[in-house]
């Protein structure tokens, strides 16, 4: 796998840990390009999808050997075969839609712009998510 131009390669990350930084740097997947998607399960798992073929592979990080010191483990990660760090398998994934560019709308409370799909209507005003007051009735 090589770096991704536009959205040719999509990564669905299930965590927000440092491994995501490597994916961005090495493979070129990013939130801004729309080909890095965050699905918060907290697992050390990453699914890579090729848009041209629909082929998807999910990597899941194996448990760390508790007997290894931190520095020893880091060195091990740099030198060992990928099979010792990750379980991986082909999987079926619904291809996510390509990133869309939304029109910006000005919040009628704070005056800041936000994409229209993130705006809310409250008391007849278009408001951003920061200014929106959730109605919960306390439960």
Language-model-derived ranges and their functions:
Residues 6-41, 45-48:
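A structural-propensity feature for long, helix-poor, extended segments
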